[in-house]
Amino acid sequence: MGLKTTISPDSSFDKIINTKTSPPLHINSPMLESLALSKLFKEENAKVWMKVDALQPSGSFKIRGVGLLCNQLLKEKKSKNEEAHFICSSGGNAGKSVAYAGRKLNVKTTIVLPNTIPEATIEKIKDEGANVIVHGTIWDEANTFALELAEKEGCTDCYIHPFDHPLLWEGHSTMIDEIYQDVQNGVCEKPDVILFSVGGGGMMIGILQGLDRYGWNDIPIVTVETVGSHSFWKSFQEKQLTKLDVSEVTSVIKTLSTRSVCSEAWEISKRFNIKPILVTDRDAVDACLKFVDDERILVEPSCGATLSVLYSKKLSTLLDINSKNILTIVCGGNGTSILQLNDLLQTLPK
């Protein structure tokens, strides 16, 4: 898996979030009912709830894990009286979150992106003060370059993988901490099913770890990928961790397009009732446009992939729907605009 960031044994999420000098960089995102989506499930008498991580300060859920990891890396560097330099490869959203963390923590940051990332996304990352390097056509190639750069710069201990690190997963699991508290406080009911998108698997690991923490392993999970970014779906079909050929990575949704989920994602998934589903790029883009009309929240197609399962009512064919409380993770994303979505929709086959 390449270089790993070394974290001292005494590091823990509780210590970090309770330290005045290292506050978390994410917010508690709102849990909202979507009346528009609930209306689609009127016959089933079901409500659709949204965990809206699109409202995170970096634009996506990624800041949960990235903020935790960056805070800890900086703490480690300060203890050695050394200067930190965060280096991260990304399909866009992890890079934006690392750049945001670097700006807030006053740390030099370099983000390596593949050449398929929109210029608008690159500019947003630069606006956070990060140095941006464009290399390769897919994330895997950008990641190889980032690892080499970290070696060259002598800062391998500040290399940040976008989805494969225990502190990233721990940070992402705070999403479930908040959902559990919302249930305890009567904001919503315990979910009967949870839907979310899968790229490299970091968010999935965090969500499943959080569910495990509260004994919610009984909740069915629906994971969503697009055709052409379907590494977890393929692993599930073949009953082993599988890597896509480069020629199979054809989705235009680059923030989902990794050749394989990380090994921990595959291992932890075995302990849960998971139903992977594939949608088309067009489904995902179309869902983004519907969602911005319905909820006035703009998300990118990696998030729209999951929303499309609700808009198309494919969920009803996946479950024996006693699911009265459907929860979808609105994970967000920075790499789009309404104009881009409309333009992209015109290029995708019907």
Swiss-Prot record:
What class does this enzyme belong to in the EC scheme?
Answer: lyase
**Membrane-spanning segments:** none
Cite the GO molecular-function annotations of the record: L-serine ammonia-lyase activity; pyridoxal phosphate binding; threonine deaminase activity
Q: Where in the cell is it found?
A: Cytoplasm
Reaction equations catalysed = L-serine = pyruvate + NH4(+)
Q: Which cofactor does it need?
A: pyridoxal 5'-phosphate
Q: Which family does it belong to?
A: Belongs to the serine/threonine dehydratase family.
Question: This chain belongs to which protein, by name?
Answer: L-serine dehydratase
**From which organism does this entry originate?**
Dictyostelium discoideum
